[in-house]
A protein has these predicted regions:
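Arg/Lys-rich amphipathic alpha helix in sigma70-family domain 2
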Residues: 48, 61-81, 101
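A short pre-motif secondary-structure segment
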Residues: 122-123
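A short, charge-rich alpha-helical start-of-domain segment used by transcription regulators
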Residues: 1-22, 29-32, 43
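DNA-recognition helix of helix-turn-helix
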Residues: 68, 139-164
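Helix-turn-helix DNA-binding module
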Residues: 113, 117, 128-145
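Acidic, proline/glycine-rich intrinsically disordered inter-domain spacer in sigma factors
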Residues: 86-113
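Structural recognition of an alpha-helix C-terminal capping motif at a helix-to-coil junction
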Residues: 33-40, 44, 53-65
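Sigma70-family region 2
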Residues: 24-26, 39-54, 73-74
């Protein structure tokens, strides 16, 4: 069982890193702590994983719950993303010769940082190219509600990107 679990973690660690960066992008130590807490919670829950949903769906659900629960416990209202980290992340995602794309991604990361926890979670899943059905499985929302929320978040991001802070 342990070997199977470790293989799954190794295969899907990028998923956990995305959640950690979304919720703790301003503090490397807090990201490491959150990563460890998520892996520990995944390990505790692993015996109950029955394969009725994809492993990634199950892992996202647990990872997001751990991150959001920690924020509520610590009463962290928002996560401030440092501009340097956002630009660095954008450069890693962008083609090396695409400075405009890099700046656009940095602006997008900064706008996402201004969203509330639930909105960050939904947009993270959406940007990871998950279907509305998969997002619904992870969040417990209906597929229609996911679509409505994603569209509202897109509108909010558009406003933040073109008109500044809300």
């Amino acid at each position: 069982m342990e070997e199977t679990f470790l293989r799954q973690i190794e295969q899907h660690k990028a998923l956990i890193f995305k959640v950690c960066h979304t919720f703790r992008n301003n503090d490397a130590e807090a990201r490491r702590d959150l990563f460890q807490d998520i892996v520990a919670e995944l390990w505790r829950a692993f015996p109950r994983f029955n394969g009725s949903v994809k492993w990634t769906t199950w892992a996202y659900r647990i990872a997001l719950n751990v991150a959001i629960t920690q924020d509520r416990r610590k009463k962290i209202a928002t996560v401030e993303w440092s501009e340097a980290l956002a630009i660095d992340a954008a450069r890693q995602s962008a083609r090396p010769d695409s400075e405009d794309l890099s700046e656009s991604l940095a602006a997008l990361y900064q706008a996402i940082a201004q969203l509330n926890e639930a909105e960050k979670a939904l947009i993270l899943l959406y940007l990871d190219d998950l279907s509305y059905a998969d997002i619904a499985d992870i969040t417990g929302l209906t597929e229609n509600h996911v679509g409505v929320k994603i569209n509202r978040i897109k509108s909010k991001l558009k406003t933040l990107l073109f008109h500044g802070k809300q």
